[in-house]
């Protein structure tokens, strides 16, 4: 299956870089690889992905730049919020996206925008923890490495009491707080077969056996700088240099992975909030209902269950986004969706009561994508 896919890339003049995992090496030794090339058209090589893909596989792409990013050769889809199961904290979100991008005019080649706006939504400390310093390991005794990693917030070896208060910073089993810290420690201090990495790193701290400077500290420091501190600093610099962050999402099955999506910036596109919200209202005088952020209401049935709209579109609209100007709407289901919703609501018996705010719950799902509020109504007592 791979041969024709690779041949298609070669016929188009693509260049490949191949990597082979060394014999005996584990997957934990695989490190991120960054390739830089001149170009102005970001691309996700999705055709290669189909070799090992599964049905409805989630694909999320982040873009840092000066403006919002949109797909070039794929469609852009707005999902229908009425099909979201708000009462279950949007547990069916992936299914809604899948059905929306698989619908008419999208045909499995489309993305939804989950966020578009100021890149400051990601704090620099989240990608570049303060205090990272490879030079701190130079000249350090081997049995002090764990303590230094704890100090730089790369390991957590703390012991806490029942109230969550820390009373020992390095006395407990250690957990790596960065995916490359564990492999780095294993490279220089391999875990014996009779124990676990978490316990071994704890025992290594202050160990008399490793109370020595006769170990490749400079090499460890260089690896730490190359794999952890340096990339973190670069990520922080990228956040500072690019004011706009776009997050796109889709799901695809192997049969749909026939074209690599490309992307472009469009300075005229509006921002997209990552707060996709609704309010669930429980009414003592009638069925529960949901109030969407745009003011529309979804009535529940008399049993307190949300409606199931089997024939209602999952896409609110399907668009083609140019490099400048407003999106071109290829398919607009808004009127049909409203008609079906109105017909459902008209068939339900709604109660009447005074509204009181009883609960506000912000359930941040998928990068703060959803916020669910709940309010209760009760009768006014004279």
Tell me the role of every PLM-derived stretch.
Residues 3-345:
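Accessory, solvent-exposed terminal regions and/or long lumenal/extracellular loops of proteins
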Residues 149, 352-354, 368:
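Extracellular cysteine-rich microdomains
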Residues 346-350:
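Compositionally biased, charge-rich terminal segments
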Residues 352-364:
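Juxtamembrane/start-of-transmembrane alpha-helix segments at the extracytoplasmic/lumenal side
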Residues 362-379:
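A cross-kingdom C-terminal cell-surface attachment/processing module
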């Amino acid at each position: 299956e791979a041969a024709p896919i690779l041949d298609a890339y070669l016929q188009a003049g693509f260049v490949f870089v191949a990597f082979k995992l060394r014999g005996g090496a584990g997957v934990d030794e695989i490190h991120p690889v960054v390739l830089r090339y001149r170009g102005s058209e970001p691309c996700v090589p999705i055709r290669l992905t189909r070799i090992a893909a599964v049905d409805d596989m989630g694909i999320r792409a982040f873009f840092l730049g000066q403006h919002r990013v949109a797909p070039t050769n794929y469609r852009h889809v707005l999902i229908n919020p009425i099909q979201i199961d708000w009462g279950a904290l949007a547990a069916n979100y992936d299914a809604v996206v899948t059905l929306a991008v698989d619908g008419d005019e999208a045909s499995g080649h489309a993305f939804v925008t989950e966020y578009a706006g100021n890149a400051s939504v990601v704090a620099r400390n989240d990608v570049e923890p303060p205090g990272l310093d490879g030079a701190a390991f130079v000249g350090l005794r081997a049995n002090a490495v764990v303590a230094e990693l704890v100090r730089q917030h790369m390991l957590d070896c703390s012991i806490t009491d029942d109230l969550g208060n820390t009373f020992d910073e390095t006395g407990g089993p250690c957990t790596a707080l960065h995916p490359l810290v564990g492999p780095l420690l294993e490279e220089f201090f391999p875990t014996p077969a009779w124990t676990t990495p978490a316990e071994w790193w704890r025992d290594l701290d202050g160990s008399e056996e490793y109370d020595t400077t006769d170990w490749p500290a400079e090499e460890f420091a260089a690896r730490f700088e190359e794999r952890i501190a340096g990339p973190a600093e670069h990520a922080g610099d990228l956040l500072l240099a690019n004011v706009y962050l776009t997050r796109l999402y889709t799901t695809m099955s192997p049969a749909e992975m026939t074209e690599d999506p490309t992307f472009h910036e469009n300075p005229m596109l509006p921002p997209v909030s990552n707060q996709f919200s609704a309010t669930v209202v429980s009414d003592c005088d009638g069925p529960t209902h949901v109030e969407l952020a745009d003011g529309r209401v979804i009535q529940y049935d008399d049993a307190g269950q949300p409606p199931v709209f089997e024939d209602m579109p999952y896409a609110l609209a399907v668009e083609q986004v140019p490099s400048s100007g407003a999106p071109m709407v290829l398919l607009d289901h808004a009127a049909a969706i409203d008609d079906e919703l109105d017909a459902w609501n008209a068939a339900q018996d709604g109660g009447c009561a005074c509204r009181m705010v009883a609960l506000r719950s912000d359930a941040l799902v998928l990068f703060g994508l959803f916020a669910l509020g709940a309010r209760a109504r009760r009768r006014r007592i004279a």
